[in-house]
């Protein structure tokens, strides 16, 4: 039960939350409100510490960071999984309902057979039925009882299978929310997270630079060593990017062999210097092929770096960065553009 003090506290928090969300360009959704109410309430110190770090690095709260903090500190496991679980369980329930309807229909038919059979048997003395006629009634009962037993067994098997399937879904759905933000192969934020964060930073009017990088000769590496080795390279580069990112620079897997780095509050000059340090670090990588045991070096990447300018949209900013990236490819790869 809410006390007068609780009410006063919640009202005071409300007055703080909404302006704070507006200040940091946070969309007014129930999830975001719950996150920021908890932040203002200072109910979870670790949440506040991580949020303060995000605000320091970005000057606002990017959508991916906010969603990640919400899932980590506020959302219950059931809430995280409920939407997909509901959809899958509805399918299972539909299948079970259909089986139950069939079984009930069979049961109703069997009841009619039993009634008719008993009536036929009551005529044994009245109509002097022959042994053969009596055996016909009994055979009909035996046959129909086998059918109903088969139908009931089928329903039981489906119920058991559904129970196992629901258990499996519960295990898998624990990853659903994470998968919505993270790339499963690299462990980095995914394209969806990138689009949301970059869009927010652009429209907040903040200084931000974008680094796009693409692994050189990736198709040839795949062809020569196989796709599993290609996956090893992607994971190795992702791990290297994570180790190098600091001061708010965040790494994303943009798609395929292409990655993106968002650098808030960084000028083109600083972002280019950082990209150059990343390029040098990647070219020192050696990845061991797990199948053959062979170590492969000479892994390089090409880079395109841009700083947001007045009038930039998400599409135009990415387009300029990609243009410079492919210029780096055309000039011989393993370089950062602009020079």
Swiss-Prot record:
Keyword GTP-binding: yes
Cofactor note: Binds 1 Mg(2+) ion per subunit.
UniProt site (Transition state stabilizer): 219
Domain GGDEF: 206-339
A cellular-component GO term for this protein: plasma membrane
Alphabetical UniProt keywords: GTP-binding, Magnesium, Metal-binding, Nucleotide-binding, Transferase
Entry's EC annotation: 2.7.7.65
Residue sites binding Mg(2+) per the record: 214, 257
InterPro entries: Diguanylate_Cyclase, GGDEF_dom, Nucleotide_cyclase, Rev_trsase/Diguanyl_cyclase
Positions annotated to bind substrate: 222, 231
One example GO MF annotation: diguanylate cyclase activity
Catalytic activities: 2 GTP = 3',3'-c-di-GMP + 2 diphosphate
Record protein name field: Diguanylate cyclase VdcA
């Amino acid at each position: 039960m809410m006390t007068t003090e609780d009410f006063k506290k919640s009202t005071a928090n409300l007055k703080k939350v909404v302006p704070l969300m507006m200040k940091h360009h946070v969309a007014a959704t129930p999830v975001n409100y719950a996150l920021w109410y908890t932040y203002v309430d200072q109910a979870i110190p670790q949440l506040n510490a991580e949020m303060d770090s995000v605000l320091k690095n970005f000057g606002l709260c990017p959508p991916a960071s906010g969603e990640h903090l919400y899932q980590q500190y506020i959302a219950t496991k059931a809430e995280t999984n409920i939407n997909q679980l509901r959809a899958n369980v509805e399918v299972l329930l539909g299948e079970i309902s259909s089986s139950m309807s069939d079984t009930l229909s069979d049961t109703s038919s069997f009841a009619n057979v039993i009634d008719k059979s008993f009536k036929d048997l009551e005529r044994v003395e009245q109509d002097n039925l022959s042994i053969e006629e009596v055996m016909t009634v009994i055979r009909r009962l035996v046959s129909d009882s086998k059918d109903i037993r088969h139908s009931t067994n089928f329903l039981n098997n489906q119920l058991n299978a559904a129970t196992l399937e629901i258990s499996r879904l519960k295990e898998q759905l624990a990853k659903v929310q994470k998968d919505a933000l993270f790339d499963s192969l690299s462990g980095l934020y995914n394209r969806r997270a990138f689009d949301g964060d970059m869009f927010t930073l652009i429209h907040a009017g903040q200084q931000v630079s974008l680094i796009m990088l693409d692994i050189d000769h990736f198709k040839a590496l795949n062809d020569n060593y196989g796709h599993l080795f290609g996956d090893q390279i992607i994971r190795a580069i992702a791990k290297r990017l994570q180790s190098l990112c600091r001061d708010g620079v965040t790494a994303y897997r943009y798609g395929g062999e292409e990655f993106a780095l968002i650098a808030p509050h960084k000028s083109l000059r600083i972002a280019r210097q950082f990209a150059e340090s990343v390029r040098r670090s990647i070219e020192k990588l050696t990845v061991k092929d797990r199948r053959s045991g062979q170590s492969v070096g000479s892994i390089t990447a090409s880079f395109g770096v841009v700083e947001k300018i007045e009038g930039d949209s998400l599409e135009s900013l990415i387009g300029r960065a990609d243009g410079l990236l492919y210029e780096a490819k055309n000039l011989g790869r393993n370089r950062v553009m602009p020079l």
